[in-house]
Design a protein with these regions (language model features):
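Acidic, Ala/Val/Gly-enriched low-complexity intrinsically disordered segments
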Residues: 10-11, 386
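N-terminal low-complexity segments that are often proline-rich with Ser/Thr-Pro
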Residues: 4, 384-386
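Aromatic-residue-lined binding/catalytic grooves and analogous aromatic/hydrophobic interfacial grooves
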Residues: 24-383
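Bacterial Sec-dependent signal peptides at the C-terminal "C-region" and cleavage site
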Residues: 3-7, 15-26
Length: 386
């Protein structure tokens, strides 16, 4: 290939520049026409500290909640200074092509000095494990029987807005739900609407598999607990606050649940924190809830959107006209037989989306499952790896 001169490069860039800058940016999204059937199909939202994954269920919906500091176990010294002595021999074996022998030497002498991660079962070991924060359960009650089918179902995730949604029609009413984890106010937010007055009835509760207590106080549901430190003592403490605001309708909170009846619009806010880095985590959780609770939903969304776009809009990738008239799962299946460059661009941007959603300044790095986990023992304890 001939070398291009600076002028030739400039002319070539001049031809492609209008294509890159003047074409309307496509709305990058994942979307589906059915609820998620397993956790891996849910849609990840996060701000680097908090995460949520809604499954978009129609009658019963579960949203998995996460906090990047929700770790069991305890600090331990895992240094192994003796390993250094075997490094020259390992290098020699590698240079001689004796990879298997080098690997065996690594296995034998390059183990950590502590007790290790309990072979990926570290929830109650000193190493610990990254665990889910909790499960948010929503039970919806419709004016027609719950057996009545639904139509026009869609759930999706906008990469450009870091906003997920679920919408469908049931009977004569159209319902819509929006979810996001605020980049600025550091809380998890959900908006539920019905297009007919007073047709929104639901119960919302929170729990987790173990180590938790729930109670209600002044209309707010609290979940608190403490994880195992792996040494027979109490470890990381945590607190979750759940609160609902309604523009109309009625609501009442009992020990672990908030009941909403005859509403048209409702807002669900979740604030959370742990003691891993902050001894005053209860005060912080309370303050975050108060600040967000005093803001209008539109203003919360606007601030979140602005902060998100500042990070996300730094990179564009245009590989041609996107074929997003098909749901994402159908595009993926068709991709095996038919080219779809737009899906490749979407995949690239989804990777960026996950990195931005899962990290933030002065927080933990992404672990094996990013910021998201749906059990108390994730894959290989959800360790960070290089």
């Amino acid at each position: 290939m001939k070398h291009m001169t600076f002028v030739q490069w400039a002319v070539w860039l001049g031809f492609i520049y209008p294509v890159c800058s003047c074409q309307p940016r496509p709305d990058l999204k994942l979307w589906y026409t059915r609820p998620a059937e397993r956790w891996e199909e849910t849609l990840p939202l996060g701000n680097g500290r908090l995460g949520m994954m809604p499954d978009g269920g129609v009658v019963q919906e579960t949203i998995v909640l996460n906090d990047i500091t929700m770790w069991s176990g305890s600090f331990q010294d895992t240094r192994n200074p003796e390993a250094l002595k075997y490094l020259p021999e390992i290098r020699r074996l590698l240079l001689e092509g004796k990879n298997d022998e080098a690997q065996e030497l690594m296995y034998k002498h390059f183990a950590c000095g502590g007790q290790g991660s309990a072979f990926g079962q570290g929830a109650n070991a000193p190493y610990g494990a990254f665990q889910l924060l909790g499960n948010l359960h929503l039970q919806y009650h419709f004016p027609d029987s719950s057996d009545v089918g639904y139509s026009a179902y869609e759930r999706g995730l906008s990469l450009d807005k870091a906003l997920a949604w679920t919408c469908f029609r049931k009977g004569k009413v159209k319902y819509r739900r929006e979810y996001f984890v605020s980049q600025t106010e550091d809380v998890m937010i959900m908006k539920l609407t019905a297009d007919r007055k007073g047709m929104l009835d639901f119960d919302v509760a929170i729990d987790r598999p173990e180590n938790y207590t729930c109670y209600a106080n002044d209309g707010v549901v609290y979940m608190e607990g403490q994880l195992d430190n792996g040494k027979g003592k109490a470890g990381t403490k945590y607190m979750v606050q759940l609160k609902v605001w309604t523009a109309d309708g009625r609501q009442v909170a009992d020990s672990a649940c908030i009941h909403v009846k005859e509403a048209t619009t409702a807002y669900v806010l979740v604030s959370a924190g742990t003691s891993l880095w902050a001894a005053d985590y209860p005060e912080r959780v309370e303050k975050l809830m108060q600040i967000a609770g005093n803001m209008d939903y539109g203003y919360l969304l606007e601030r979140h959107d602005s902060a998100w776009r500042y990070k996300y809009n730094r990179v564009e990738l245009d590989l041609g006209t996107p074929q997003d008239i098909l749901p994402t799962d159908q595009r993926l299946a068709r991709f095996q037989e038919q080219e779809d460059p737009g899906l490749v661009a979407l995949y690239f941007q989804y990777g960026r989306y996950l990195l931005i959603s899962g990290t933030r300044e002065n927080s933990f790095p992404l672990n094996l499952q990013g910021l998201w986990a749906n059990s108390e023992i994730g894959r290989a304890s959800c360790r960070e790896r290089v």
